[in-house]
């Protein structure tokens, strides 16, 4: 139970007979209002055609996609070039110099997903929000529900739930660290309050 609500996952059996999780269809279907997705390059090289391509070989690059307000579902499929250090989503972005943010980090080399925050070092959180994950073919299906400061992420068949305290609304975007990524089937949807 979290704040009076139960977070529900649907169990799914993997090919090796272990269990994974996925977002229940009823939750996904509650997000019905399509929100605008507009790529705004911030750092690095970003372009959109049939897919969104991001490249930053020597550091951090990111592009803004839209606004977070109320309950929002992000969905997309991420592919990365071999050697890419990290990629993922920028969440609750604020300020002209990215003064506030959370990240859903996908780290292929380390085989994990994690949530990091702008104030993680100097803040009051003394633990890491991360999960081990297996990646196939340099690709991951990403779903993220943002409800106020609650984040519920599904990456392939692994879930990670956390809070970004002191952050509300703001922007949402994509990032890459030392590599090249491709996002396809990117959607933002608003849900019921």
What are these regions (language model features)?
Residues 1-193:
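Extracellular glycan-recognition regions
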């Amino acid at each position: 139970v979290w704040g009076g609500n139960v977070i529900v996952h649907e169990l799914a059996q993997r090919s090796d007979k272990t269990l994974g999780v996925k977002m229940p269809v009823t939750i996904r279907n509650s997000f019905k209002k399509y929100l605008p997705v507009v790529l705004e390059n911030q750092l690095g090289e970003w372009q959109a055609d049939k897919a969104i391509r991001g490249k930053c070989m020597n550091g951090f690059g990111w592009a803004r996609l839209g606004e977070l307000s109320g309950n929002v579902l992000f969905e997309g499929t991420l592919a990365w070039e071999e050697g890419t250090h990290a990629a993922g989503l920028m969440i609750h972005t604020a300020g002209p110099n990215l003064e506030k943010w959370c990240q859903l980090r996908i780290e292929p080399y380390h085989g994990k997903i994690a949530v990091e925050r702008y104030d993680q070092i100097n803040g009051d959180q003394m633990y890491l929000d991360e999960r081990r994950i297996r990646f196939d073919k340099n690709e991951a299906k990403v779903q993220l529900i943002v409800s106020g400061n609650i984040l519920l992420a599904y990456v392939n068949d692994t879930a990670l739930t956390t809070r970004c305290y002191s952050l509300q609304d703001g922007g949402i975007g994509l990032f890459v660290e030392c590599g090249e990524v491709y996002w396809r089937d990117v959607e933002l949807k608003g849900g019921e309050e």
